Structures are given as C-alpha cells and as structure tokens.
Design a protein with these regions (language model features):
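Aromatic-residue-lined binding/catalytic grooves and analogous aromatic/hydrophobic interfacial grooves
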Residues: 38, 42
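Conserved small/polar residues in nucleotide/adenosyl-binding loops
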Residues: 178-184
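All-alpha RGS (Regulator of G-protein Signaling) helical domain and cognate RGS-like helical scaffolds
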Residues: 46-51, 64-135
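Extracellular structured ligand-interaction cores
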Residues: 128-130, 140, 160
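Acidic, low-complexity proline/glycine-rich segments
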Residues: 1-12
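Catalytic Cys-His active-site segments of thiol-dependent hydrolases/isopeptidases
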Residues: 143-146
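Alpha-helical scaffold segments that form or flank carboxylate-/histidine-based iron centers
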Residues: 18-32, 55-80, 148-150, 155-163
Length: 186
C-alpha cells in the first residue's frame, strides 16, 4: 500500500484564529507530513511491509528498544499520527458527544480534570512526541504520552484524541524575539 498525503479537511488557514497559523499549517502538513509520506513510501518499496495496512506495519515494525533506528516504523507511524491529528481538530467549536462526555467524566471525574491531565501530559512530554486520549483494551479511557512517533496502535489502544507536541507543530507560532538582545557596535 502506498502512503498518501490526505488533503486537509478544512482550509489551510482555518485554524489561524485558534492559534495555528497558515504558515505553521503549510510547514506542518505540506513539508513535515509530506516528508513522512515520501520517506515511508521509499523505505517500504520491495519490503514485506509494502502491501500491508498502516496498522499492520506499525505493530509489525514497532520495537521499543530500537525505535530511533527504525525508519519504516518512524515514517509510517508519524504518517498515521498526522492523519489522525488533522481529522481530530477543526475550525468550528463542536460540542462533545454526550457518550464521550459521560465516559470522560466517569474516567477522570470531570471534563475539566481530563483537560488538565491532557494538557499536563503534553506539557511534560520530554522531547518530541504526542499526548493522547485513548480507549484501552479493557474499555477504559486514559491519557497517555508517547515519544517520537510511537502511538496507541503499538499498544492495542484506540486513539480518541491526539496532540502533536513535536516542535514543528508550534514553533513558528510561538517564536518570540522580545528576549533577544542584538549586539551594538562600539
């Protein structure tokens, strides 16, 4: 199966008023995500994984002790992560389905507590990675975080919400030059 870079389900500038500028989206989707697709397709050619599903490739190539050296896993997994990411957000505020709200309240005590836990997971991810709301194999909801391109598929979990905490997802919109002091000529 060839990896395909999906079109965004909204205009490239649709998230600007929510903190993700058109420039960030162009870099994130059109450059970073596209690179995962292109690299993944090149690495998959002629391998046993070439005609497998994304999930089969992710599960079959995941090895926690050698993730950093596994180009197929990293590129395919990051492609999967980003395909989920683009679908999980949008420009319009949509109410949470009552079934999900009830499950979150049951699992975390309240929606606000879930939001706190989710934001904390993203903020405390050391280095690059993702934070997730997942449905575990036993049906319970959990907030997790994963390093690099690792995702819930690796652990038999279902991703309900994911947040990319790699620098490329926010660095353009969070750069502040106010702390810089330029040298002056003597």
């Amino acid at each position: 199966m060839s990896l395909v870079l999906s079109e965004l389900p909204y205009a490239i500038d649709a998230l600007a008023e929510h903190g993700m500028s058109k420039e960030t989206m162009e870099y994130h989707h059109d450059i970073h995500h596209k690179a995962y697709v292109d690299n993944g397709n090149n690495l998959l050619k002629g391998t046993e994984w070439e005609n497998k599903s994304l999930e089969d490739i992710i599960v079959g190539t995941y090895n926690a002790s050698s993730v950093a050296q596994n180009g197929i896993f990293n590129n395919v997994s990051q492609h999967w992560n980003h395909e989920q990411f683009w679908q999980m957000m949008g420009p319009s505020k949509v109410g949470m389905p009552s079934e999900l709200e009830n499950a979150i309240t049951e699992s975390f005590g309240s929606v606000d507590k879930f939001k706190e836990d989710f934001c904390n997971a993203g903020a405390t991810q050391f280095g690059s990675g993702w934070c997730w709301l997942v449905k575990d194999k036993d049906g319970s909801l959990k907030v997790t975080k994963t390093e690099n391109g690792v995702n819930p598929v690796c652990f038999g979990q279902t991703a309900l919400l994911g947040c990319d905490v790699w620098e490329h997802s926010y660095y353009i919109d969070s750069v502040s030059y106010t702390h810089l002091t330029l040298p002056t000529k003597a």
